[in-house]
A protein has these predicted regions:
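Short catalytic-loop micro-motif centered on adjacent basic/acidic residues
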Residues: 116-118, 178, 288-292
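Amide-forming acyltransferase catalytic core, primarily the GNAT-like/NAT-type
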Residues: 2-73, 77-78
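Short, conserved active-site entrance elements at the starts or edges of catalytic domains
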Residues: 190-241
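Conserved donor-binding loop and adjoining core beta-sheet/short helix segment
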Residues: 48-118, 122, 237-265
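Short, polar loop motifs at secondary-structure junctions
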Residues: 120-127, 162-165, 296-297
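Acyltransferase donor/substrate-recognition loop-hinge adjacent to the catalytic core
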Residues: 6, 132-209
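Active-site/acyl-donor-binding loops of N-acyltransferases
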Residues: 2-17, 136-155, 289-322
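Aromatic (often tryptophan-rich) hydrophobic motifs at membrane interfaces
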Residues: 230-322
Length: 322
């Protein structure tokens, strides 16, 4: 999640277009973004969750995103308080070294000598190619990838605790799972507020607090525009009240990404139950893998994701220039 690197996450920036070719990134660009993925050859089981439009679009009320095309290649830029950067590689048929070089030329024009110029969410094959071309890279936290079948079943001793929590929800609470509908908007917002209060009552570090402050804005955008950017949602109800929700998207026909998940923390095991049901539904629809994204450098989230025994933590690199 790129926002964790910003000094003030909730800054509302004045949109300043520094190049006439730049256009504001909206949901209308979703088809264009998707078309650009194929010739870029970046989608595979090891692809990062960032190579989907929803991953970026939900944050555009907090951080202006801009796009442009050059040599039939799609460039996506984010305008942070510190300057301009790219949240993912240029997408298109142009040679990677050429398009990345062009991207850094533009960012250096806009940012001057500032080290903020960078390209995030670069995968291992592209990183190796760019290093051969003289580009410098540094590693950042990667996405957690799981076998969908394993998370749907939660079989064996390795998943004993998660399975017990799911069983407790089934035994003690009458929870129903339903697809998200537009009429669920208000109930999900109410839950989001309650969840944020519960989280603040726990042990959050300063970064966790900052991420939480921006969550409501991003989640509210999802509730309203989910279908415009390829998201599907699920809600859990108890006695008619929404007590959990989750949204995700298909990164590839074999990989389902869990974009966000919120569960009432007063119901023990509810988060684990919802995650299992999400994985079951994805597996039924053909998913071989579940991408649960990164851990945002939060120790608690890292421990929770490792407890599900990922098959891989996908390499994720930042290109810093030559």
């Amino acid at each position: 999640m790129v926002l964790k690197e910003l000094p003030t996450l909730t800054a509302r920036l004045t949109e300043l277009r520094v190049d006439a070719r730049l256009r504001s990134f909206t949901a209308a660009e979703a088809p264009r973004f998707t078309r650009a993925l194929e010739p870029a050859h970046v989608l595979s089981p090891e692809a990062l969750a960032a190579y989907a439009v929803a991953y970026h679009y939900i944050w555009t009320l907090l951080l202006p995103y801009w796009w442009m095309e050059s040599h039939d290649t799609f460039f996506l830029f984010a305008q942070s308080p510190d300057g301009w950067f790219m949240p993912l590689l240029p997408l298109g048929p142009a040679p990677l070294e050429q398009s990345v070089g062009e991207a850094f030329e533009l960012m250096h024009q806009w940012n001057g000598p500032s080290p903020v110029s960078r390209i995030e969410n670069v995968m291992e094959p592209q990183k190796q190619e760019l290093e051969r071309g003289g580009f410098r890279c540094r590693q950042k936290g990667g996405d957690y990838l799981y076998k969908a079948e394993a998370l749907a079943a939660l079989a064996g001793d390795h998943y004993k605790s998660q399975r017990a929590l799911c069983n407790r929800v089934e035994r003690e609470h009458l929870v129903t799972i339903e697809p998200y509908r537009a009429s669920d908007h208000s109930g999900c917002l109410t839950l989001c507020d309650r969840w944020a209060i519960q989280k603040r009552g726990g042990t959050l570090d300063s970064m966790g607090q900052l991420l939480l402050e921006d969550a409501k804005v991003a989640h509210d955008r999802v509730f309203v525009e989910y279908d415009r950017v390829g998201l599907s949602g699920t809600v859990a109800r108890r006695h008619g009240e929404i007590v959990a929700y989750t949204f995700g998207y298909w990164l590839t026909p074999q990989t389902y990404c869990v974009l966000l998940e919120v569960a009432d923390r007063s119901i023990s095991g509810l988060a684990q139950f919802l995650f299992r049901e999400t994985c079951r539904a994805a597996s039924t629809r053909g998913a071989l893998y579940i991408n649960a994204m990164d851990d945002a450098d939060l120790p608690g989230l890292r421990a929770a994701k490792l407890a599900y025994r990922p098959t891989a933590v996908l390499d994720n690199w930042v290109v810093m220039g030559r």
